[in-house]
């Protein structure tokens, strides 16, 4: 095994991702492609001991020189875990910039043919350029029985539009063979590729396939056509918590406790499987027909996070971003407990803990402002929210090695039997008044009133004959599993 060497080191000015200020960072570029930044210059013995503020890989990177927003700026476009990121740096002279660019490019070129065989399968390697340039190393371990008939668009009746987003739409469908109802998420490949969301989408598919928990949305099938990816998921027709809270303005503490407990149970399960959710927000929390929580939309999940492991990709809704994300630092599982704090604050207080239409001001509030609580809150609720919304992730409730157990043992949840939570034995405080599987009263009629337009079915007739090499971005995407076991 080759010894990892420091190829180049020195001070760089790095631009913040959200708060666009320049911060001095001492960076080390190593022969294994790691590009790590520290607040202070570490001495040689500290390299492996000090936790870095920034940790990137220059493998498969692209480099760009620019004189904006400052002279002698360069941008690195690279893969951070499974997401394509861009980071902006600035130095004092053109010569210094050239030295860094040559060093980074040399390391990146040297790594091109050195991917170990055992890592090749796991690396979801996103390359840049035209679709044909994308490596088929973007693979997913899909346990799929070979004898099972393949699923196509023709296997479903398309009933109602449930939602629309940047990448596609969600439609209420009925499986023709069984008469069962599902939510089908249809994503347009060209948009996913254009917006560098390939890795996020593959992550969503893999997380959905490998998780089974009462409060996580189950995946029934995943398949693709020539231009679309389709997830056929459990259909939760109780509506988004956002929908209900926006109509009721505030929930009682008991009701918030119930939803909070089910979210904690789901996060404990994900964290135990080394998955950090990262995008807890009301819009991603659905209710099923009985009133239990279903967490949806796994596109922002980051896989492979263990205690103490951190990640450096930017995603999430601005109002829900944790301070450590804004401060441009590595972050770990504690971001989910911050997210829980924000949604529980919304439920019990009827507003976001920090809000401003101006994002720069919003980020300032998240970083600096003390959390304020209405006088109507109980001491236990106040204590829980204050703990979850601690700025320092190490001090945050749930931020220690015990993770979810810290949250579960808080006084606010003293009345909760956690075994009963997981077994769905607690009575939901609100039961959606749905009269049938196709009752969409809790979905926005902005969508449900629209007619569904799909490409004519004959476009899909022979798509399952496509070989994986004709699908360079999404090989082995298909999946089939019984939700109702």
Curated annotation (Swiss-Prot):
InterPro entries reported for this sequence: AGC-kinase_C, Akt2, Kinase-like_dom_sf, PH-like_dom_sf, PH_domain, PH_PKB, Pkinase_C, Prot_kinase_dom
Q: Where is this region: Disordered?
A: 454-485
Q: Where is the Protein kinase domain?
A: 156-413
Residue ranges of the AGC-kinase C-terminal domain? 414-485
PROSITE patterns referenced in this protein's UniProt entry, alphabetically: AGC_KINASE_CTER, PH_DOMAIN, PROTEIN_KINASE_ATP, PROTEIN_KINASE_DOM, PROTEIN_KINASE_ST
User: Where does the PH domain start and stop, copy by copy?
Assistant: 5-109
Q: Does the keyword field hold Iron-sulfur?
A: no
Q: Which GO terms describe its cellular component?
A: cell cortex; cytoplasm; nucleus; plasma membrane; ruffle membrane
Ways its activity is controlled: Two specific sites, one in the kinase domain (Thr-313) and the other in the C-terminal regulatory region (Ser-478), need to be phosphorylated for its full activation.
What functional role does this protein have?
Akt2-b is one of several closely related serine/threonine-protein kinases known as the AKT kinase, and which regulate many processes including metabolism, proliferation, cell survival, growth and angiogenesis. This is mediated through serine and/or threonine phosphorylation of a range of downstream substrates. Over 100 substrate candidates have been reported so far, but for most of them, no isoform specificity has been reported. May be involved in the inhibition of ciliogenesis.
Protein name, UniProt field? RAC-beta serine/threonine-protein kinase B
Q: Which organism is it from?
A: Xenopus laevis
């Amino acid at each position: 095994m080759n010894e990892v060497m420091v190829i180049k080191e020195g001070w760089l000015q790095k631009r913040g991702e959200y708060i666009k200020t320049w911060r001095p960072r001492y960076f080390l570029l190593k022969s294994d492609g790691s590009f790590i930044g520290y607040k202070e210059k570490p001495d040689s013995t500290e390299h492996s001991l000090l936790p870095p503020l920034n940790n990137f890989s220059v493998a498969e990177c692209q480099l760009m020189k620019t004189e904006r927003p400052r002279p002698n700026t360069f941008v690195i476009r690279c893969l951070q875990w499974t997401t394509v990121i861009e980071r902006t740096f600035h130095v004092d002279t053109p010569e210094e910039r050239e030295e860094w660019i040559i060093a980074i490019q040399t390391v990146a070129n040297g790594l091109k043919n050195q991917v170990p065989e055992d890592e090749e399968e796991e690396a979801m390697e996103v390359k840049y350029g035209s679709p044909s340039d994308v490596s088929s190393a973007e693979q997913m371990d899909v346990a799929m029985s070979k004898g099972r008939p393949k699923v196509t668009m023709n296997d479903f009746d398309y009933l109602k539009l449930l939602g629309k987003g940047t990448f596609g739409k969600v439609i209420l469908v009925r499986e023709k063979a069984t008469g069962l109802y599902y939510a089908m998420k249809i994503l347009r490949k060209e948009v996913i590729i254009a917006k560098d969301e390939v890795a996020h989408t593959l992550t969503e598919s893999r997380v959905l396939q490998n998780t089974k928990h009462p409060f996580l949305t189950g995946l029934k099938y995943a398949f693709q056509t020539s231009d679309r990816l389709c997830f056929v998921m459990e259909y939760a027709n109780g509506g988004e918590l956002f929908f209900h809270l926006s109509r009721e303005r505030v929930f009682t503490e008991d009701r918030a406790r119930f939803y909070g407990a089910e979210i904690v149970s789901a996060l404990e399960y994900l964290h135990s499987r080394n998955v950090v959710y990262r995008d807890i927000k009301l819009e991603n929390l659905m209710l099923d027909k009985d009133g239990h929580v279903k967490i949806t939309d796994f596109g922002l999940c980051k896989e492979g996070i263990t205690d103490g492991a951190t990640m450096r990709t930017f995603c999430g809704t601005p109002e829900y971003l944790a301070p450590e994300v804004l401060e441009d630092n590595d972050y770990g599982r504690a971001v989910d407990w911050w997210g829980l704090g924000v949604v529980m604050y919304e439920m019990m207080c009827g507003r976001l803990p920090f809000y401003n239409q101006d994002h720069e001001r919003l980020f300032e509030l998240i970083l600096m402002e003390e959390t304020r609580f209405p006088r109507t809150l109980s001491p236990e609720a106040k204590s829980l929210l204050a703990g979850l919304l601690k700025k320092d992730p190490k001090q945050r409730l749930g931020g220690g090695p015990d993770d979810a157990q810290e949250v579960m043992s808080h006084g606010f949840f003293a009345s909760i039997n956690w075994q009963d939570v997981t077994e769905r034995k607690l009575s939901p405080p609100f039961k959606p008044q749905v009269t049938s599987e196709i009752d969409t009263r809790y979905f926005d009629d902005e969508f449900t009133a629209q007619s569904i337009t799909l490409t004519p079915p004959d476009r899909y007739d022979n798509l399952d004959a496509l070989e994986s090499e004709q699908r360079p971005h999404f090989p082995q995407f298909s999946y089939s599993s019984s939700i109702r076991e």
